[in-house]
Structures are given as C-alpha cells and as structure tokens.
Amino acid sequence: MVIKKLFILIFCLFLIINEINGKKTKINDIKKSKPKLSSTLLNVHIVAHTHDDVGWLKTVDEYYYGSNMSIAFAGVQYTLDTAITCLLANPERKFIYVEIAFFQRWWDEQSTTMQNIVKGLVESGQLEFINGGYCMNDEATTYYDDTIDQMTLGHQFLWENFGVMPKIGWHIDPFGHSATQARIFGQLGFDAFIIGRMDYQDIEARLENKQMEFMWRSTQSTPENQVFTSVLRAMYCTPDGFNFEQGDDPIQDDPNLFDNNVDSRAEQFTQVALEYATHYRTNNVLIPFGCDFAYLNAQMYYKNIDKLIAHINSNPDKYGLNLLYSTPSIYIDAVNDANLVWEVKTDDLFPYADNEFSYWTGYFVSRPALKGYVRQNNALLHVVEQMLVTSSNLMPSSRSEQLVDDIVIMREVMGIAQHHDAVSGTEQQHVADDYAERLSIGNCASLETINTVVGTLLTANGNSKSAAATPTISFCPLLNQSICPATDPLSSGTSVPVLIYNSLSWTRNEPVRIPIPIANVTVTSSSNGSITSQVNQINGTFILEFLATIPPLGYSTYIITSTASDFVEPNSIPAIIIQDEIIVSGGGKINEKVSYNDPIILENDYINVQFSSQDGSILSITNKTSGVTSSITQEYIWYNPSVGNDDSAQCSGAYIFRPVEDFAYPYNNATPSVSIIRGEISSSIRRFWSNEMVQTFRLYSNADHLEVEEIIGPIDISDGIGKEIVSRYTTTLVTDQTWYSDSQGMEMQKRITNYRPSWNLTVVQPTSGNYVPVNAIAYIQDPNQSLQFTIVTDRSRGCASLRDGQLDMMMHRRTLKDDGRGVGQPMNESTQIVTTSKLIFHDISSYAQSHYRPAALSLSHPLLPMFTTTQQSSNDWNSQYQGVYSPLTSASPLPNGLKIQTLQWLDNQDNTILLRIENIYQIDGQDSQDPQTITLDLSTIFSTITITSATEMNLTGVQKLSNLSRLKWKTVDGKNYDHKSSSSTKEDSSNGFVFTFSPMQIRTFIITTN
C-alpha cells in the first residue's frame, strides 16, 4: 500500500512541476525507454486489451454502465476502473484502450486528481491509446467522410487531454477490410495496421508461407499512404486456457500447495507462443490477452499474467521465451528493427469468409433504412458545420460559441453510428432503435442550429435587411414519402419561400421535388424572377418540380405562391399541371392509346431511354452525345435464405448471406400498373405492384443520367420464408467477368468474379462469395465497344456481377434465423425503404469519372430545402431578405475536381478552423486521360473568411505534417515512398497560400482567420 501511494505521489508531482514551469508537454515528443528485448529468445509481446463494442447486444449506455447484465456481462466503467488500479499497482503492467466514445465518458466522470494520475500512466507508457477513433468503425458500410470524422473526434480528444497521437491502427473485429481504411491510416501517419479477420483461404495460405505481415499499398493515386499490416494469428481474444477472467484455471505457483500448476501452465503457454512464431518472420510475436469487454475484474488477469511472466522469464533455457507486457506500438517497433524486406499487397480484403459456407456479405445490406439515415445525417452534419463557420462573423461571439457547442451532439452520435455493429446493421433490434433515436436527437439539434444560422443570414447585409423580422425556418424530413407540412400554408393563400442549400463546392443546377397541397402555383426565383415549374398529380398527391441553381456552400430562394393568392406577381408563370397517364392496369390490361409493340420513350438532349409498353420495364439506353446504345433489362429477384442443411448448419442472418441455392426467384410475377408523366422538367415511368414494391424511372430535362426511385418493403414473410431482394441489371456489354466497386465512396476497386488477386480461390459459394460492399458507385465496362454502365447509390449496398454484362444490387433483406455470429437474433426487420439510384451510360473515352463522381456526390450530399412563410409578394420578400447567399468568392472558386470536404470550427474563440480539400478524381488507367495535379490558392476561396495562416496537418488535424514521422519499411519492389513525397510541408505559405492536390489526395489544414 505504501509503494502504491508513493507511485501515485510521484506521478502527481511530475505533472505539477510541468504545470509550474508553464509547459504543456506533448507525450508524443517524450522518448519512452524501450523494453528489454532478446536477440536470441522469442519475444512474446503480451497485449492486455478490451474490445468494447460501442453498441451491439446492448446499447451504448447499457454497455458503459453495466446494466442489462442478462444480455451480456459487461460494464466499461468498471473495466477502466479496475484496469487503472492494476496499472498503478505494478509499473511493469501495460494496457491499451481503443474506443474513445467510452473513454471520454469515463474521463469526464473522474476527479482532477484521478485525471492527473491517468495522465501519468499515459506519460509512462503503461496506458496507451491505440487507433484512437471515437469507435472502431466498420469498413464496408461506412462512407469515407464519416470514417475520417469519427477518427478526428477521437484524436482531437486525445490531443487536447493527453497530447498524444496514436501510431497504430487496431481493427481487430471489423468483418473485412477496405482499401480506403488502409489509405486513411497511412495518411494519419500510422506506423502499422493490425487486423483480426481475414478470409479463411487467404489466411491459410499466409500462415503456411509466413506472410501474416506485409506492406499494404491500397491506392494507386496516393501510394505514399501505404501502411505496414499485421494479421493476428488467432483473432483478438486470449489463447484458449488462459482467459483467467472467464473461468480458466489460475496460475498456482505456491510450492506448498498440492495443486501447484505453474510448470504445466508455463509449458502450455510456451507451446502456444512457439506455434504462433512458426507463422511470423521475426523473433517477435504479439499475443492478445483480452476479448470483448474484458478486464471487468482486471486483477484476475494481471495477477496471473504476472506469475506467468515471472516463471517463464526465470527459466529462459527451459522455455526459450522472453515474455513482456507490451503494446502494439512496441511490437511494431521490434518488427521494424528486424529490417526485413516485405511483400506488397494492393487489393482489399473483401469479401470475408470464416469457412466455406459462411461469407460475411449479408451485412452489406442489413438494416438498409438505418444505413440510409446515417448517410442522410452525414450530409446534414456537413451542412451545419459549414454554416457555423461561414456565418460566425454575422453573430455575437457568445452565440456562435454556443451553436458550436450544440453541434457536438451530432458529431458524437455520428461517431457512434460508424461502429462496426451500428451502421453495419448487425446489432440487436433494441440497439438499432437506440442508434436511430440518437441520430434523431442529433438531427433535431442540427436543424435547430440551421434555423438560427439561416435566420441570421437572411437578415444580413444591408440596413433594410437587418431591420426585417427574422423568419422561422422549418424542414420536411419526409420528402421521399411525399409529405411536407411546411407547404400546407399554400392552401390558405400564404406564400412559401424555399431556401435550398448546396453543401458542395460548385454551383449545382438540379431538380427540386416538393410535395404541395394544391396544384395551381407559381415559382419565383430570388435572382431570376418567375421560372418554369411542373406539378405532377399522382394518386391524389401533388409534387412540384423545378430546376434550381444553387451557389456553392450557399443557398438560393424560390418562392412558391398559389395562383389564387393576392401575392401573385403579374408576370408569373403558372406551373404546368400534369396528370399521370395509366398505360397498363394492374392486371396487365393494355391501354388502347398505346400500341402493344410500341416502346415508351423518355428522352432529353443527352439520353434516350426506351421502356416496354407491356409492363414498363426498361429496354435500352442511348447516350446521344456519344451515340452509343445498349439494350438493358432490370428485374427484381430474391434469394431464399438458408436455414441450414446437410452440408452446414449455417443460416443466412445479420452478417452472413447464404442462399439455399444459387438460383434466384422473380420477386413478383404479376404485371405492375404502369403510368407515365411527360413534362418540361421531368418525365417518368411509374411501376406499381403493391404498396410494398413501387419503382419509378425518372428523366430530368437537364440530366445525363436516369434516376431510379424504389419503394421496397416491408418484405412479405407470410409464407414463412425470409427473402433477400436484389435488383438485377443486364446489359449487352462484354465485360470478361470484370467490374468495379468503390471503396467507402473513394477509389474504385477492380473485381473479377470467382477470383482473388492474392491467392488461388476455391469457389464454394458462387453467389454470396462474389458480393462486395458498394457505398456509392459500381460499374461494368466493355473495352472493345468503349462502353460503361454505372450505378450510383444513396447508401451502402452489396453488389456482384455474376454474369457478363450484369450488375446485381442487393436492396433489402429479411431472414428468419440467427446466423450464429453472436447477435442472437434473426435479421427479421419489417421496415420499408425509399431509395434512389442513378444509372449512367456513356463512352469510356468521355472521361468517365466526370460523369459518375459528381453524380455520386450529389446523392451523398443532396440539396437541403428549408421552408418559411410570408404574407408578401415575392418582390417585397426579396427586398427585405438576402435570398441568395454563398460565402465563396465566385460561383466556381475551386478548380474542377477539387472539393471542400471539411469546414468546421476547431476553436472559434481562437478563430481556428479545420479545412480539408480533396481532389475527387483518381488515377485508374482506364480513362483516355487521367486526372492531373491541381493547384489552389486557399486565400481565393472565401469571401466571408480572411485567412491569416494555413498550417498543413495530418488527416485528423492534430499533428503538423512537417512533424509527421513514420517508420521506414523495405518492400520487394523497392518502392519505399516518403509519406510527404506528394505533399508540401510548408506551414505558412509565403505565396498566397498556394498548394497542389494530386489525384484522390485529401489535404488537411488548420487555418486562422481575423
């Protein structure tokens, strides 16, 4: 007890002395003493850890507080309490922690004294933060924006409170690994990426060939972001027989006891360590001690590990081992010191299977409504972050600071939602409900903030405007369900101004669809007067459509007025009212107005699309600009989820997609009702089978793509059979089994059906084994005809190309059996989804990325309509309020290809802003022209912000790029990229803040303003 108190006192005195000297020591700058490693013995790095899911079987709160123990015996607060106590009892012990969402809660509950003690443990290296994100994010269903944001949230906390920046990526539980995740970890400056899961065939080959560690160069565009990767030998839990917290025999080393077992237990552990060593190339092995929510009673672990280490190390000749408490960073340093040459991997780690019948490809689609809601809130968070920065000069600093504090709610809930059992859809139902509720709370908080900011912007700039009453802003979150209470005042003659916000970095000329209660309206633009509009009358509802021109990071206003209102301007243009025309009734009866064989044609200046007059199905698509044509069909099919059979008991469930057979059934054999709308703004074909299956093909007058809106679900299980629903597109393209999918919305990955670049694949599951995640983009190409067919999605899905010229997109799934991977519930979700895709068909030589990249960003960052009301004419309203706003210097201040990815306050008291700018195009070698490096002067972007300094940082904004130092590794190809090889390291540009951006590069800056 005396030693323990003295140990604590020394820590506290050390911190007090630092404070007195006025120093804020950054722990990354402190050279910790290296552990004693052996050059002749096998060094066994024991890594004490807990894997704390930020929700899974229990909610985040239940896991933290330890409630609902009947579901899972876990309480993170007790884990941290007991682990810290055990570290203080023995300075040799170490512990790593990963999930900052939990640690931040625990930290905030601690006294100042305890916080200082913990800082001392971090200083000494006993407690080390690994990975350091708000959660351990999924890699298949997360968007790259969200991944970077949640890592930033965790790293900012660690830097502000401890002065540390993690150096190792630790993703030991996600169910497959993406190229983008590896690239992000490289750009963060991580020295290594440690993973726990790898396909069973891949890992068998690697174990045999000692290739469990390699250099992962996952991107052609930014190869300097390669990262050394190490695969754990046997997942991330304690070796069998040594889980002292869960009932395995303790180490009994008292020679006076009859049941002394220290020799046999040491021999047992030695065999484990030596087996591990046969698969790795250095005399170092990492053996994790811990598992899910481990160290709830940390003393049970540490006391026994102490004995194991002491006994084995006292007998080096007998056991041949050097055991030590270690961390992943210590282990990686030791591997690096071996100075070996490493193989290079360039493909990703999808799909993942843990045996021949179990491909983890179902979760790419599980809970698609939640996946869509997460994506929607990502877009909203970026809107509110942008607004808070660009409007802060218009409001009192105290008000601006409060609004920035308010948005932390949304940042944190979005950080939680990226967890690998959250957006992935692999949680229990009550946990999914909890995530949705948290997102809803964050959503409401964000909309309240936007209401305040937009009110400020509307009344800014000019005395007359500033004297106007601040309007109240409302929103219509159910626009995709044709519900918008904000437009109800039109029925009583009140006009409805609609402010439409664009969060992208270029002017957008896009269609807007708004449900309205009446048909006879006009639309007036704040900048262009009365404009053409269209009202579609469908099943008794009215949908207003018009083309809106919106400046970057800003809004434009369009005022909707009833033609019967007293506020109609004399020269206003009434909306064109269009009644949908029934072409085919539900029973398949053909309307006499249409010849049986004549196709239905939707056409604009860019594309021509033909549909069957029998059932409204798509027949062909022609790109009128390049003159290329392909026949194309689309059908809904479903796979019968396995409930186990003689080959394997494996069921299809939350994680696993395992169909009973590779044959897929037509989802609905009935002929749908088909209706058509033709208008100046849009024309569409609507196919209605039932309220559970509706498909609309929509062609806008200014679009080079075809939009597809689909309503699917709840999935019918009245026959007692679950269903996994796929939308299959079949073209005449000859694709040679090759197709492409994005990686978390970023770089495209080449896929070849029934093939893996890294090993010789034995095909056992030809359907589920070929599905990979798609977050935004999938396409097929016919090089001989120079044709490309692209599908752009609004949320993550699973995709495959099982036949030449085909793309299969899994849309929704509902299974009736648990798949045995821990969640303990079937994927029996009864939700309906409303989802939007874009179909793009073009000549490869027409620089394909310029078509699909902006289209994908448009879906991921949709325009945001904001509504208010007025009892004024549009002219009077425009004279009082700022109807058009952009904080940028022009309609296109950024060169084509550059995008402001992040614009958010770091500290608005110090006027410091986190700014990320990305080049959205990649080097892929497929286009006739690859993107070039783009130059930008940061000082020319903003009109409302004057940049006084710009310091380039690592990706999460906590470490100067000029100070970033990574371990050097040798590779078999000799390409040992410098992390800064394509990046300027100048902190403050003396030439107008000029920087260059190579293809697919994201550069991060902390800028200060006046």
Curated annotation (Swiss-Prot):
It comes from Dictyostelium discoideum. The active site is at 173 (nucleophile). The gene is manA. It catalyses: Hydrolysis of terminal, non-reducing alpha-D-mannose residues in alpha-D-mannosides. Pfam families: Alpha-mann_mid (PF09261), Glyco_hydro38C2 (PF17677), Glyco_hydro_38C (PF07748), Glyco_hydro_38N (PF01074). InterPro entries: Gal_mutarotase_sf_dom, GH38_C, Glyco_hydro/deAcase_b/a-brl, Glyco_hydro_38_C, Glyco_hydro_38_cen, Glyco_hydro_38_cen_sf, Glyco_hydro_38_N, Glyco_hydro_38_N_sf. Glycans are attached at residues 68, 480, 520, 528, 539, 623, 760, 784, 828, 954, 963. SUPFAM superfamilies: Families 57/38 glycoside transferase middle domain, Galactose mutarotase-like, Glycoside hydrolase/deacetylase. This is Lysosomal alpha-mannosidase. The keyword Signal applies. SMART domains: Alpha-mann_mid (SM00872). Belongs to the glycosyl hydrolase 38 family. Transmembrane segments: none annotated.
